């Protein structure tokens, strides 16, 4: 297959990670793939480093420029379909009337209702197939008026690496200045209100009153960073919390941790949680949004509500129960290997492509 993939986001978040995994996986399986992306965006740079052709759209008038670029690419190259990774790319495709030439597929990763204004509805009508990352997101599309036959579910996936060695753990902890006898919880997520990192900061005084050796690493950046740092100071936990900012080599974070905590109040499928489970980390998570499709409480991860007290109780359970940590570590990794690997995600994406092309040709 010949696929044009489009993503106009400038920042690197979970959706862009999935785009990179998809593009690389498609190429490894013999498919021809190219990317249309914002100039000098994190995704454009990483995909280019992977040896895949990238067409970079100017940052000025991004969507209009991308619309023209998409028209030109489709006229010059024999693409069979266009996979849009986020809403800006959909706008560009719609402006360029790409849907009149090729089938459009749109990835959908969050359960917000679709916008009801006339322009938004016109854009959504141009989509041949919505690719929802979970049952929860698929239901939100149906609730917004999208017919079920226009929706396919492809769970997001993560790479499965060998478990860390003791030497890798020790090296990663030295990077963050964590002692061997300290118990390190961590979270990887953008700093916005709905990600809920404040619940972990609020849990920390309760946990450290009994276990002063506990520390917390909050990897990421965003609008709530200053607020979280202020809360940390207010609760007297400054020395116990690391704020390293955005970490490109995120494997170094997972390698350093003893356990992972994911306090999101509104989430798609939670690839950061999947990656932590794949790394063999015993995990605690809410079940908001689609997280309930990943977290099987007491088996693959501890399920709690989004508040500091519940996280504190679960954190203390993990600290005090080595057998529980071992069971969650093994079951969580096994769950990701079987259901949420990058390989599964790519194969299921290919099945959707084939189904769309088959039905388009029949039509």
Predicted regions, residues:
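A short helix/loop element that forms part of the nucleotide-sugar donor recognition site in Leloir-type
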Residues: 163-178, 333
């Amino acid at each position: 297959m010949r696929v044009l993939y489009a993503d106009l986001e400038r920042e690197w978040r979970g959706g862009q990670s999935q785009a990179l995994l998809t593009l690389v996986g498609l190429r490894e399986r013999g498919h021809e793939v190219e990317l249309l992306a914002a100039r000098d965006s994190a995704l454009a740079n990483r995909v280019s480093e992977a040896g895949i052709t990238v067409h970079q759209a100017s940052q000025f008038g991004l969507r209009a420029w991308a619309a023209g670029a998409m028209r030109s690419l489709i006229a010059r190259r024999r693409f069979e379909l266009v996979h849009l990774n986020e809403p800006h790319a959909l706008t560009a495709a719609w402006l360029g009337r790409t849907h009149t030439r090729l089938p459009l597929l749109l990835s959908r990763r969050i359960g917000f209702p679709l916008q009801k204004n006339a322009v938004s509805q016109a854009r959504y009508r141009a989509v041949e197939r919505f690719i929802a990352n979970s049952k929860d997101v698929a239901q939100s599309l149906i609730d917004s008026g999208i017919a079920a036959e226009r929706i396919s579910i492809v769970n997001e996936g993560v790479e499965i690496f060998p478990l860390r060695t003791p030497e890798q753990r020790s090296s990663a902890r030295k990077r963050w200045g964590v002692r061997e006898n300290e118990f390190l919880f961590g979270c990887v997520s953008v700093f916005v209100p709905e990600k809920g990192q404040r619940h972990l900061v609020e849990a920390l005084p309760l946990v450290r009153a009994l276990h002063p050796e506990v520390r917390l690493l909050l990897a990421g950046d965003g609008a709530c960073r200053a607020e979280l740092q202020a809360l940390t100071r207010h609760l007297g936990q400054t020395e116990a919390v690391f704020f390293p900012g955005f970490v490109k080599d995120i494997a170094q974070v997972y390698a350093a941790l003893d356990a992972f905590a994911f306090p999101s109040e509104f989430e798609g499928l939670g690839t950061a949680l999947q990656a932590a489970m794949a790394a063999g980390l015993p995990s605690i998570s809410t079940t908001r949004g689609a997280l309930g499709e990943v977290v099987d409480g007491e088996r693959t991860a501890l399920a709690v509500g989004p508040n500091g007290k519940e996280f504190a109780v679960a954190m203390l359970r993990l600290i005090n129960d080595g057998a529980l940590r071992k069971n969650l570590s093994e079951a969580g990794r096994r769950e990701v290997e079987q259901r949420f690997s990058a390989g599964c995600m790519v194969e299921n994406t290919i099945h959707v492509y084939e189904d769309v092309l088959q039905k388009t040709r029949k039509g």
